[in-house]
Amino acid sequence: MNTGIIDLFDNHVDSIPTILPHQLATLDYLVRTIIDENRSVLLFHIMGSGKTIIALLFALIASRFKKVHILVPNINILKIFNYNMGVAMNLFNDEFIAENIFIHSTTSFYSLNYNDNVINYNGLSRYNNSIFIVDEAHNIFGNNTGELMTVIKNKNKIPFLLLSGSPITNTPNTLGHIIDLMSEETIDFGEIISRGKKVIQTLLNERGVNVLKDLLKGRISYYEMPDKDLPTIRYHGRKFLDTRVVYCHMSKLQERDYMITRRQLCYHEMFDKNMYNVSMAVLGQLNLMNNLDTLFQEQDKELYPNLKINNGVLYGEELVTLNISSKFKYFINRIQTLNGKHFIYFSNSTYGGLVIKYIMLSNGYSEYNGSQGTNPHMINGKPKTFAIVTSKMKSSLEDLLDVYNSPENDDGSQLMFLFSSNIMSESYTLKEVRHIWFMTIPDTFSQYNQILGRSIRKFSYVDISEPVNVYLLAAVYSDFNDEVTSLNDYTQDELINVLPFDIKKLLYLKFKTKETNRIYSILQEMSETYSLPPHPSIVKVLLGELVRQFFYNNSRIKYNDAKLLKMVTSVIKNKEDARNYIDDIVNGHFFVSNKVFDKSLLYKYENDIITVPFRLSYEPFVWGVNFRKEYNVVSSP
């Protein structure tokens, strides 16, 4: 990161369309390392710091020299990248070749490069003289995409830009794959990773630390956004190590079926989906079925005396008394007195989706664009609504998030409760969420942070003085009240095995976190920083941001204004060239956002430079406006 670029900005205004100083400083580093030196980079920027815009700005610059292939996890994130590409183009004040940029989902990329599940090696020549940008890079390994990336790296000898807010998912194995992909050498995992009998005993050994420092030297960019522009986080529940957890004591009914499931079905309890299910809610015989879809077709099948299922529909008094779920009993009781929007994470999409829907409906909460709840709760004269997001409803996710994030929904009057499975753990942004709930314990520390990072990020809150509430729910035995204050108290298996599943899961998470934090601190220390004049390839982009910042505070200045000239000459040292640049932006009517006039264009008026507000107007028959800095096309019948 070029800290000299950050020093050019003073009191940067973030509330307008903008490129942040750290993004420009990182862009300089990427151009020098990937384009000039042909070396791969790991962009390890913590969630919410704007990795996507950095990557797309870099793609626009790189398109002048090479083809750029951007790989994203799924079609929904591809839509986000396509939208953000438009944002990046509008902020980009230089030439680029759009035809050289290709954005693929992993599915389409697989189809493009495999024939009958075999890599089409002859077709890989299309990636010669290319650069690959991989979003959520920690997720591509252990599948065909990771295999293909390794083949392309070895065959085509091209650099990669790997984006990740959490380069370690479950164990250091992921980091080992990243090192292998970024370096010119083949990594022997047996030499750098030590393995014990348990997953939590998978560690990066001293040899691995040395390999990491040696092979990735100069290839790491670490950044974490300052939290000064974020709301405070208020964790609820009792103290649990370095966080807080809400103990939800199970009823005798739930505890009985919980223990039956644990004894009969869970040979490897920490990884068994059945324990996720019964920790959320018990459903009698449903807990004993490996194929839930089969039982969902049953007609009026009794699960408990006061709970039945009919063609996949749950009904009965138990959905209100909630002896089947200590977590939902706490949740339903708590939300009645809370204001604002809720984001609720759960991992068991099929089972959890069924439980959530009918508990919410039975307790007076209506399904968004669906069934109305019993005796519905109201807000502003409208029912309080919920939606459940799983991988099965990808097609409507974008529209749903538009409603959830709209300013009109800041109070949750359009959509108050958003339940989501793992599909929402990465890449999406949620606005004005005041309550974050964990109905199931995440598998990894990185996943936990990613879920929080969907909401708690820069620009997601208008009022940062109001805290965000986090509820990490754990189903525990009716008599369980242990204080968990130190991991050292739980080093023996016999002490851990008697704990409730959720508590074991949390301890497991914390054990892995120790190793994750150790490696992250090494990566942070390796992050490349320097102070140099800006790279020639980013000069116009940098000047564009400086001009936007200048004219936010200045509506009218003299054409030969000394402050403007000084600002431009901080980048373009030659005064004549600096004056020519000022002529170009004024005669080209550069777009700015002014604090008085809002969206404006620069004009020369007599001996002054003025900001002239504008707006797009159109006749009723116009059905499409494509507005970019290069052109303005109006399409009509």
UniProtKB/Swiss-Prot annotation:
Helicase C-terminal domain residues: 327-507
EC class name: hydrolase
Signal sequence region: none
Motif DEXH box location, chain numbering: 135-138
Pfam families linked to this entry: Helicase_C, ResIII
Helicase ATP-binding domain segment(s): 32-185
GO cellular component, one term: virion component
KW Nucleotide-binding (keyword) present: yes
Binding, ATP: H45, I46, M47, G48, S49, G50, K51, T52
Molecular functions per Gene Ontology: ATP binding; DNA binding; helicase activity; hydrolase activity
Role this protein plays: Acts with RNA polymerase to initiate transcription from early gene promoters. Is recruited by the RPO-associated protein of 94 kDa RAP94/OPG109 to form the early transcription complex, which also contains the core RNA polymerase. ETF heterodimer binds to early gene promoters.
Assembly behavior: Heterodimer of a 70 kDa and a 82 kDa subunit. Part of the early transcription complex composed of ETF, RAP94/OPG109, and the DNA-directed RNA polymerase.
UniProt protein name: Early transcription factor 70 kDa subunit
Source taxonomy: Viruses, Varidnaviria, Bamfordvirae, Nucleocytoviricota, Pokkesviricetes
